[in-house]
């Protein structure tokens, strides 16, 4: 198999990278009806598998779970989750031949083995579904020509997919049809019905492509969503302790600071996040973010280049073949860092204190979000896709750090995201070492001193913040998400 994207000519690559259309709500007037009365078999019962299945069943669909024989015989976690929730469970051989739609929600590294097992069992004219297109785009999996291949990719962890559905809402979602596998022209109808069954149509759906979803998803998770948060956590903790801050206080300021800061980002974009600062602090955060963007731009561009070329995927798949040696080594090293092993401060940190004493963290968020967005757009990805893969998902990832630090983040995200996160953070930490020595009092751990502010400078900074392209597209897309619940848990 060959990387699918690399088999396309330049015109085809650009067309698929740039495929992105925000779908009108009336396009989902039929809800999940196209799949009602049909058999949907989900392979895998992890966070996405279970929670999408629960939503789809509650939307009136016939859902069952196909698991490996040994998972059933040994009553593994996937079997327990499916059976405890009242789902029919069977082997591939028992369930797949009757399925109208087989949804592959196993981890990326298992996709080829799963497809190799289920494809011969699928009936003529059935459909195969994914929630991430890595197997199709990067691995270049070849699917039988009579099979329709679709994708429904919720832009949230599986737990959020379920919680928002239970509230009568949903999470923003990308849908796509693989152009090489739509023999009956029904791919879009299947994808729309599946998205509606999960509740995604209530929060906004983008019609995308497998290529655009994969390339933007990889870029977001490697840089701002995971890599920047990990690098920032390690750098900021070490700096605070070096300056004499109690390690326990420093740990709490960072662990819960990302979440508190990005909750403002979720509600009102970079503009609201920056507006939570005093005027002198806002000017300083803006200046720091501009410095960070200049330093980190080549690193962001390298990650995008390696994603576009397939270099990243090739390296990661080589590590898969080597029993995840690099991934497991990096995971162990991260677990031994001073930030991960520090005790936690017992006292309370107020919400505003996280902003006032986290100016550098705010600058890192602003710089990382804007750089990820700009780099994706410069590579041909449409602004709406770039927004969802940068700013939108950041509060959700920050929330995992608030639960159990970097360990929890790396457990919750996919192995693909974790591998890319380590590549970025291992490069970013030394890259910013010299910058960290230039920090001033008030940048981190202490509030910026009050002082005179130049009105013209403040006016220009406010205009620069609000006029960035991500603020414009974000204002529009957040309009569809006003009902999403607040997720921050910091105390």
Swiss-Prot record:
Ligand binding (Mg(2+) 1): 217, 221
Statement: the UniProt record of this protein carries the keyword Amino-acid biosynthesis: yes
Active site per UniProt: 132
Free-text comment on the cofactor: Binds 2 magnesium ions per subunit.
Pathway terms, separated by semicolons: Amino-acid biosynthesis; L-isoleucine biosynthesis; L-isoleucine from 2-oxobutanoate: step 2/4; Amino-acid biosynthesis; L-valine biosynthesis; L-valine from pyruvate: step 2/4
Chain positions recorded as Mg(2+) 2 binding sites: 217, 389, 393
Domain KARI N-terminal Rossmann: 15-208
InterPro entries from the UniProt entry: 6-PGluconate_DH-like_C_sf (IPR008927), 6PGD_dom2 (IPR013328), KARI (IPR013023), KARI_C (IPR000506), KARI_N (IPR013116), NAD(P)-bd_dom_sf (IPR036291)
GO cellular component: cytosol
Residues reported to bind substrate: 414
Protein name (record): Ketol-acid reductoisomerase (NADP(+))
Native organism: Enterobacter sp. (strain 638)
């Amino acid at each position: 198999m060959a990387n699918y994207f690399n088999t396309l000519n330049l015109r085809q690559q650009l067309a698929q990278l740039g495929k992105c259309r925000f779908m009108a709500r009336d396009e989902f007037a039929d809800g999940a009806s196209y799949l009602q009365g049909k058999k949907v078999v989900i392979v895998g019962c992890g966070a996405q598998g279970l929670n999408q299945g629960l939503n789809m069943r509650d939307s009136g669909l016939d859902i069952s779970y196909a698991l490996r024989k040994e998972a059933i015989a040994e009553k593994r976690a996937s079997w327990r989750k499916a059976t405890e929730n009242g789902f029919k469970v069977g082997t591939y051989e028992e369930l797949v031949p009757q399925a109208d739609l087989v949804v592959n929600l196993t981890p990326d590294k298992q996709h080829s083995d799963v497809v190799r097992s289920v494809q011969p069992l699928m009936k003529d004219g059935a459909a195969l579904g994914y929630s991430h297109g890595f197997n199709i785009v990067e691995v270049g999996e070849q699917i039988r020509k009579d099979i329709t291949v679709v994708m429904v990719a919720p832009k949230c962890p599986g737990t959020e997919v379920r919680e928002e559905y239970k509230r009568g809402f949903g999470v923003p979602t990308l849908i796509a049809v693989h152009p090489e596998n739509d023999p009956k022209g029904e791919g879009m109808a299947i994808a729309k019905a599946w998205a509606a069954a999960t509740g995604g149509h209530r929060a906004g759906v983008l019609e995308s492509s497998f290529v655009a979803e994969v390339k933007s998803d990889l870029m977001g998770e490697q840089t701002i969503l995971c890599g920047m948060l990990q690098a920032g956590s390690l750098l900021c903790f070490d700096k605070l302790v070096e300056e004499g801050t109690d390690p326990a206080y420093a740990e709490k300021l960072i662990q819960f600071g990302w979440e508190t800061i990005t909750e403002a980002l979720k509600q009102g974009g970079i503009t609201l996040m920056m507006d939570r600062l005093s005027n002198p602090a806002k000017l300083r955060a803006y200046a720091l973010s501009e410095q960070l963007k200049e330093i980190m731009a080549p690193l962001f561009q390298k990650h995008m280049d390696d994603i576009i070329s397939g270099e990243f995927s090739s390296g990661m798949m080589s590590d898969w073949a080597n029993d995840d040696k690099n991934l497991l080594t990096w995971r162990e090293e991260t677990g031994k860092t001073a930030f991960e092993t520090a005790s936690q401060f017992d006292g309370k940190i107020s919400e505003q204190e996280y902003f006032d004493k986290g100016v550098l963290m705010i600058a890192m968020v602003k710089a990382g979000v804007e750089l990820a967005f700009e780099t994706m757009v410069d590579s041909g990805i449409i602004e709406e896709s770039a927004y969802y893969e940068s700013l939108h998902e950041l509060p959700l990832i920050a929330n995992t750090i608030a639960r159990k630090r970097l360990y929890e983040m790396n457990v919750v995200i996919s192995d693909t995201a974790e591998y890319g996160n380590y590549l970025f953070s291992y490069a970013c930490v030394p890259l910013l070492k010299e910058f960290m020595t230039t920090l001033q009092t008030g940048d981190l751990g202490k509030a910026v001193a009050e002082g005179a502010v130049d009105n013209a400078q403040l006016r220009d900074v406010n205009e620069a913040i609000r006029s960035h392209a991500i603020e414009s597209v974000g204002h529009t897309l957040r309009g569809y998400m006003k009902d999403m619940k607040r997720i921050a848990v910091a105390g």
